[in-house]
Every structure is written in C-alpha cells, then in structure tokens.
Amino acid sequence: PLNTEVTAVLLGSNVGNLVDQLAEYGADKVIVVDDPELETYRTEPYAHALAEVINKYKPEIMLVGATAIGRDLGPTVSARVATGLTADCTLLEIGDFPLVAIPGKEQKHNQLLMTRPAFGGNTIATIACPDNRPQMATVRAGVMQKAEPKPGAKAEVIEFNPGFTPNNKYVEIMDVVKKVAETVNIMDAKILVSGGRGVGSKENFKILEDLAEALDGTVACSRAVTDNGWLPVDRQVGQTGKTVRPQVYFAIGISGAIQHVAGMEE
C-alpha cells in the first residue's frame, strides 16, 4: 500500500454540488476547477486545466476513466506533462519494477504496474513508468468494483484557477446532437447468457435470447461474435469488451480464451 491520500479532480462549470459525492466515494481532497470555459467538453481547455493541476500538485499517480472523453483527455495531458500513459488498463497493482530483480539494474519499489491487452488483444502486457511522474493510466469501466459510499463523509476542497486564455486550439461548439440508441448495459446484469463462435450463426442466438428471457437475464458474447457482426459491441465481454460481475454466467460455444476470461473471472 502507498499510504497516501486520494485526491479527485473535478472539472466543469457549476459543478461544486458534486464535491460531497466524491467525498462519500473516498476522496480525501477534491481539487475543483469551476469555470464557464469548461461548460461543454473541449479538448484544449480541459487538457490545459488538468495539466496545470498536475504541474502544481505533482501527483505520483493520475488515473482517468477510459471513457470517450478520457481517451481523448488522458493522452493529451500526458504529452503536455512529459510522461507516459497506459491506456485501457484492465488491472492496476503496486509492486516492484523490473518485476524480477536483474543484476546490475536498480529495482524500484512502489511502482504502478499497469496491465492491458496488446497486439489486438492477442497478448497481455504489464507496463510501468519508473522514470517519469505522474504515472498515468486510463482505466476501463467495470474493472474496479464500485465502493459503497460513506454518507456524510467530507473532503478538503481546493479551489484552483489555471487561467484560461482562448487560442486557436479552442474549438467552438455550434450544436450538440444526441442520438438515442437502444443499448444494453451488461455490466449490471445479475445473470448473463453469453455466446461465442460455437453458437454457429446470428440466427442461433435466438435460442440464447429465449433462455435469457426465461431466466430474467441478459445476452452477452465473445469478441468472435461481434467481429462476425452477430451482436453489437456493447454486448462483448473480455479485455477488448466489458468487464462483468454477474452472479451466474452461462458460457455457450465459448472456448475460454484468456482475453475473454479476464472480462468475467470475478
């Protein structure tokens, strides 16, 4: 364990009401950057704000959600503060690097060891950033279990103003069009009926859908199924899909490759 404080960074406009929620979920401190320039996500002002926070407070580790925004913001910020970033991590651990001591090479302790799929999901890599700070990673939703909130918990609030100077990198948002799509959140399902290439065809998934309906469950799948276009990617379980924690998991026609098992082993 690092025996250190956890600090959340809250970026946005009129977001002060979220501080207590962050405290209840474990933040010891909350750095708040509240500015009209952050009303809608744009890469430049958000990257500037977060980079300035890092430059001032110099954290050892900076974690960002591997969401659509996080996958844009994380790499931009890491480049600005001259450090590395490991994207789409499926496991985070604290340990020694190199993992095994090498004669003549210093083994550094309390390093963030970041595990993620590599080479198209065909192998798993554990990556460290021993020489630069902060150690940065984006972490996929569902990888870490959501802690139970502690009602009434309070955090130290730090108001921070990075100073915004609009430049030619600031885009102007003309309009936002939201498309409402029918998606299924398999990460919250208690019962999953998951099919793989062995199911045989898109039509055969009707059998799995009937079983899932009878059990009040949800249909999921392996990567081979989404690659074949039988089901949409929001149903995919695995290192290149979603991490799930159902109470019951039916694996039908799935070979059990390590990349798939990594998404449901807990």
Question: What are these language model-derived features?
Answer:
Residues 1-266:
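N-terminal glycine-rich FAD/FM-binding segment characteristic of electron-transfer flavoproteins
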